[in-house]
């Protein structure tokens, strides 16, 4: 049985049909799905993602668990509909080391949510949710949208890029840079994994493509693009006034799915209470940008709880938090520990086959 067959089997399961009906009932604000162990939760969730019209946000316990869950979903659904929302820091926030790749992923999620795409799936974890994000207004004010066939002056585009803080270079190789060669503008947006190559014909955008940094060769043709700068620097200058909780950024009809609501609250509170290490402060003070501060840029456990209770919630951990409005019980089991003993694996398979399971 391959992944597609497994997913189809889950899609036709009566319990999954029951969950989908409950999620259409607006009176059900808190749903508990018990008995979903290991990747069973991912397979079950993939069906919900395919049928959803609202954003689904899966909040796992930590970065590693979220990474495994994201990998499972992308193996089933692909990467177009499933997004990963990490912390913007390379290690724990208290070390103060920003990660440009993670900031790209975060900005991409915000941009896609801003567009109002149906059935978008976001996988995240408490350390990422502890950090505030830019408000919808701030993101909109700092977003340049272009599409093939659009009439726009090339000089206007470069002026906007400069005003957004993009750095002019000969060759683009990292986010926040742009280059101009004849009628072509290369720009690396903080909302895209790959940089864009915009080809002009006079005052018209003739074509837009992504390209590989290493080879500088074009990769994929795009009909439209969104260019977003590094908003963290501009917000550091303005203070925390343009920042909100990620949950504040979400549409009100979003569904929050999690294993353990109380653990998320406690972990976010821990992240909020941690201070920057002396080494992190010293390192930042020695840079041109000066010392980093986390004041006003993190939410605490209480704020997370307050915001989360505004949304519909689905829990799929060992036990629910409080009394759910509805409960659906699955009957999956934890995989036995085989210790690389293939005889035990074979015996386990034979036993399942004798009980009329499909493998």
Predicted regions, residues:
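Conserved beta-alpha structural segments and adjacent helices that either
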Residues: 1-359
């Amino acid at each position: 049985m391959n992944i597609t067959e497994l997913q189809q089997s889950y899609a036709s399961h009566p319990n999954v049909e029951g969950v989908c009906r409950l999620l259409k009932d607006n009176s059900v604000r808190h749903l508990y799905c018990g008995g979903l162990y290991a990747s069973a939760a991912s397979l079950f969730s993939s069906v919900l993602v395919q049928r959803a019209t609202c954003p689904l946000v899966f909040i796992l316990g930590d970065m590693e668990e979220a990474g495994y869950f994201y990998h499972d979903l992308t193996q089933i659904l692909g990467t177009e509909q499933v997004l990963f929302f990490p912390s913007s820091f390379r290690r724990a926030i208290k070390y103060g080391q920003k990660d440009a790749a993670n900031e790209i992923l975060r900005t991409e999620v915000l941009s896609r949510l801003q567009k109002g795409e149906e059935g978008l799936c976001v996988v995240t974890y408490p350390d990422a949710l502890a950090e505030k994000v830019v408000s919808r207004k701030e993101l909109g004010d700092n977003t340049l949208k272009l599409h093939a066939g659009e009439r726009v002056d090339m000089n206007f585009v470069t002026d906007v890029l400069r005003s957004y803080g993009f750095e002019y270079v000969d060759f683009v190789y990292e986010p926040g840079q742009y280059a101009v060669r004849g009628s072509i503008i290369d720009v690396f947006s903080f909302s895209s994994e790959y940089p864009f190559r915009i080809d002009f014909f006079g005052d018209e955008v003739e074509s837009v493509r992504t390209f590989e940094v290493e080879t500088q060769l074009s990769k994929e043709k795009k009909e439209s693009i969104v260019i977003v700068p590094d908003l963290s620097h501009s917000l550091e200058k303005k203070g925390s006034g343009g920042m909100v909780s990620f949950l504040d950024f979400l549409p009100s009809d979003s569904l929050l799915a999690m294993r353990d609501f109380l653990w998320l609250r406690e972990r976010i509170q821990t992240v909020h209470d941690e201070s920057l290490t002396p080494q992190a402060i010293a390192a930042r003070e020695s840079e041109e940008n000066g010392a980093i501060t986390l004041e006003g840029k993190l939410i605490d456990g209480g704020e997370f709880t307050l915001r989360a209770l505004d949304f519909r919630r689905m829990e799929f951990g060992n036990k629910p938090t409080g009394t759910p409005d509805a409960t659906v019980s699955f009957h999956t089991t934890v995989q036995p520990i085989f210790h690389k003993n293939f005889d035990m694996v074979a015996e386990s398979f034979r036993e399942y086959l004798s009980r009329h399971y499909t493998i």
